[in-house]
Amino acid sequence: MLKPSIICLFLGILAKSSAGQFYFPNEAAQVPNYGRCITPNRERALCIHLEDCKYLYGLLTTTPLRDTDRLYLSRSQCGYTNGKVLICCPDRYRESSSETTPPPKPNVTSNSLLPLPGQCGNILSNRIYGGMKTKIDEFPWMALIEYTKSQGKKGHHCGGSLISTRYVITASHCVNGKALPTDWRLSGVRLGEWDTNTNPDCEVDVRGMKDCAPPHLDVPVERTIPHPDYIPASKNQVNDIALLRLAQQVEYTDFVRPICLPLDVNLRSATFDGITMDVAGWGKTEQLSASNLKLKAAVEGSRMDECQNVYSSQDILLEDTQMCAGGKEGVDSCRGDSGGPLIGLDTNKVNTYYFLAGVVSFGPTPCGLAGWPGVYTLVGKYVDWIQNTIES
């Protein structure tokens, strides 16, 4: 039986939200027969008593308890009955083998300046499937790229992804592309943004309570680093990837957090044919601005030969450092940003985390034409370049 002190400890954890507000379990949240549930990490799970989920129970009793673990536990609650907390326990943690045999470590090669799974790509949001609108804390690595224009005016016209305390990844065409006006200078990034019309951003949750994020963070860019082999005038836009070095380190929060790079050797070589991924953003491009609210869409990776057949009609020859995804009318990277992320999900016995599968490069005009997938730079092909380029 779960000790009363542990019940009190867990309820105390659940009571504190990241915005400083309080949540007390209520009977409306009960699952009478417990049943199936989906974790904050987007895994299939079963709603059971906390003490019956050995992994999460062990996580709870770990000292000190990390903020990310505290928030994960809070958002994993699926009910409260007879004085006991119910927790959404992933299927893989209820298998006897996972409780007795340490899981294998992923085959990862890393630079010490880059965060590893567990430190990046965290999934803390209670995800809504099939929706277009993101949650306020969903995809906290997303960045808006700021340009300083003539007469000192500023605007956001590309996107990017935070990969460490000091670096953002975007597209090279957002740095020195042929469509960029000559009087624009890439000057900064905005992090922790959700609704560009408000600051701070607030969202009303299912309990009718207001959940507010801290004010967004504007950080100057110290140096832009387009890929050395990128050719702005090329039709196929090969090597359309760039690094932005920030002028200062950023502090991670629930709303500003890096995405993982595909460091696992299997991910580095993957082409993602038939794999469903997320594209997200404000629809910002070098020429247009579409939405004040961060949006998302699910897109499916396309076979390269099929995508090549489509783009051959435009005399565009794609290479193995690129990939295609989407092709459904009105979706695709219309909801993403130039330079923004194509987001994959890796589930293994150690961590479940989001990783940067691709960078939005180009697509049909107008975007979202049926039968025309968007083209993305395949980030796994550039891991070596990224690791060799970043500095402390």
From Swiss-Prot:
InterPro entries named among the record's database cross-references: CLIP (IPR022700), CLIP_sf (IPR038565), Peptidase_S1_PA (IPR009003), Peptidase_S1_PA_chymotrypsin (IPR043504), Peptidase_S1A (IPR001314), Ser/Thr_Proteases_Immune/Dev (IPR051487), Trypsin_dom (IPR001254), TRYPSIN_HIS (IPR018114)
EC number per UniProt: 3.4.21.-
Gene name linked to the record: ea
Task of the protein: Component of the extracellular signaling pathway that establishes the dorsal-ventral pathway of the embryo. A protease cascade involving ndl, gd, snk and ea results in activation of the spz Toll receptor ligand; acts downstream of ndl, gd and snk and is required for proteolytic processing of spz. Activation of ea requires both activation of the ndl-gd-snk protease cascade and sulfation of a vitelline membrane component by pip. Localized activation of the Toll receptor in the ventral region of the embryo defines cell identities along the dorsal-ventral continuum.
Domain Peptidase S1: 128-391
GO biological process terms on file: dorsal/ventral axis specification; dorsal/ventral pattern formation; maternal specification of dorsal/ventral axis, oocyte, germ-line encoded; proteolysis; Toll receptor ligand protein activation cascade; ventral furrow formation
Effect of R335C: In EA 125.3; results in ventralized embryos
Reported effect, G371R: In EA 161.13; results in weakly ventralized embryos with ventral denticle bands that are approximately normal in width and the filzkorper have the normal tubular morphology
Keywords recorded for this protein, A-Z: Calcium, Developmental protein, Disulfide bond, Glycoprotein, Hydrolase, Metal-binding, Protease, Secreted, Serine protease, Signal, Zymogen
Leader peptide range in chain numbering: 1-19
Effect of R335Q: In EA QGDS; results in lateralised embryos
One Gene Ontology CC term in the entry: extracellular space
Phenotype upon changing P373S: In EA 5022; probable loss of catalytic activity results in partially defective dorsoventral patterning; in gastrulation, shows an intermediate ventralization with the headfold prominent on the dorsal side and some anteriorward displacement of posterior cells along the dorsal site; in late embryogenesis, shows partial filzkorper and head skeleton, as well as ventral denticles erroneously in dorsal position
Domain notes: The clip domain consists of 35-55 residues which are 'knitted' together usually by 3 conserved disulfide bonds forming a clip-like compact structure.
Glycan attachment positions: N107
Subunit architecture: Interacts with Spn27A; the two proteins are covalently linked leading to inhibition of ea catalytic activity. Interacts (via Peptidase domain) with snk (via N-terminal prodomain); leads to proteolytic activation of ea by snk. Sulfation of a vitelline membrane component by pip is required for proteolytic cleavage of ea by snk but not for the interaction of ea with snk.
Amino acids binding Ca(2+): E193, D195, T198, D201
Pfam families: CLIP, Trypsin
Modes of activity regulation: Activated proteolytically by snk; activation requires both activation of the ndl-gd-snk protease cascade and sulfation of a vitelline membrane component by pip. Inhibited by binding of the serpin Spn27A.
Keyword Cell wall biogenesis/degradation part of the UniProt annotation: no
Main location: secreted
Consequence the record notes for mutating E193 to A/K: Probable loss of calcium binding which might affect catalytic activity
UniProt-recorded name of the protein: Serine protease ea
Highest taxon listed in the record's lineage: Eukaryota
Xref: PANTHER family: TRYPTASE-RELATED
Molecular function, one GO term: serine-type endopeptidase activity
Record bears the keyword Protease: yes
